[in-house]
C-alpha cells in the first residue's frame, strides 16, 4: 500500500493550533489545488470532543468560506480528521498559511457568535447522519481555546520523518 503524505510527517513534533500545507497538486488543466492540515490540538496529547468536532464541522465549513473564498481561492471541502485532532481543507488556489490562519481565527470568532444550537446549519435528520450528536457549548469551548492560543504554522521540512525512521515503522 502506498505511504500517504500525511504519514510522512512526525506527529510527535507538530505544534497546535497550527496550519500546514499538506499537499499541492494541479488539475489536468493546470488549476492549483492545495490541501491544508488545520491542526486544532497536538496529536496523541489531546483530542477534540465528538460532539464539539461534529458541530464545528457544520459551522466551520461555512465560516471559512466566508473569510477565505475570493477571486483566487475557492474551498472545495473541509472535513474532520479521523483522529479528531483537526480538519483537512482542500481548495482551489494557493493562499498563504497566514491567510488561512487569519480566516481560521475569524471563523472561531464567528462560532462564538452563534447563540443557540438551533442556529447550527443542517442540524436535522435529512441533512446530517447523526443530527443529535452536537454540542454548541463544546464547539465554542474549542473556538475559545484556538483564539486564546493563536494559530502558528507547521512546516513539512521541520516535521519530515527520515527514511531511516520510515523504514523501521
Curated annotation (Swiss-Prot):
Species per Swiss-Prot/TrEMBL record: Shewanella sp. (strain MR-7)
Family the entry assigns: Belongs to the LuxS family.
Function: Involved in the synthesis of autoinducer 2 (AI-2) which is secreted by bacteria and is used to communicate both the cell density and the metabolic potential of the environment. The regulation of gene expression in response to changes in cell density is called quorum sensing. Catalyzes the transformation of S-ribosylhomocysteine (RHC) to homocysteine (HC) and 4,5-dihydroxy-2,3-pentadione (DPD).
Pfam families reported for this sequence: LuxS (PF02664)
This protein's name: S-ribosylhomocysteine lyase
Keywords: Autoinducer synthesis, Iron, Lyase, Metal-binding, Quorum sensing
Superkingdom as given in the UniProt entry: Bacteria
Cofactor: Fe cation
Residues reported to bind Fe cation: 54, 58, 128
GO molecular function, one term: S-ribosylhomocysteine lyase activity
Oligomer and partners: Homodimer.
Entry EC no(s): 4.4.1.21
Gene Ontology BP, a term: quorum sensing
Cofactor, how bound (note): Binds 1 Fe cation per subunit.
Keyword Disulfide bond belongs to the record: no
Enzyme category, top tier: lyase
Gene3D superfamilies: S-ribosylhomocysteinase (LuxS)
InterPro entries tied to this protein: LuxS_sf, Metalloenz_LuxS/M16, S-ribosylhomocysteinase
Reactions that this protein is recorded to catalyse: S-(5-deoxy-D-ribos-5-yl)-L-homocysteine = (S)-4,5-dihydroxypentane-2,3-dione + L-homocysteine
Amino acid at each position: 500500500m502506498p505511504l500517504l503524505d500525511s504519514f510522512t510527517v512526525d506527529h510527535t513534533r507538530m505544534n497546535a493550533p497550527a496550519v500546514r500545507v499538506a499537499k499541492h497538486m494541479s488539475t489536468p488543466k493546470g488549476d492549483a489545488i492545495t490541501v491544508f492540515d488545520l491542526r486544532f490540538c497536538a496529536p496523541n496529547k489531546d483530542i477534540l470532543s465528538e460532539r464539539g468536532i461534529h458541530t464545528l464541522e457544520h459551522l466551520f465549513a461555512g465560516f471559512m468560506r466566508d473569510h477565505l473564498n475570493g477571486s483566487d481561492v475557492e474551498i472545495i471541502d473541509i472535513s474532520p480528521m479521523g483522529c479528531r485532532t483537526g480538519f483537512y481543507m482542500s481548495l482551489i488556489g494557493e493562499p498563504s498559511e497566514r491567510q488561512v490562519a487569519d480566516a481560521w481565527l475569524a471563523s472561531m470568532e464567528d462560532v462564538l457568535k452563534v447563540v443557540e444550537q438551533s442556529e447550527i446549519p443542517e442540524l436535522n435528520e435529512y441533512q446530517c447522519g447523526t443530527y443529535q450528536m452536537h454540542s454548541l457549548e463544546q464547539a465554542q469551548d474549542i473556538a475559545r481555546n484556538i483564539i486564546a492560543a493563536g494559530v502558528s504554522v507547521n512546516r513539512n521540512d521541520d516535521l519530515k520523518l527520515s527514511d531511516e525512521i520510515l523504514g523501521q515503522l
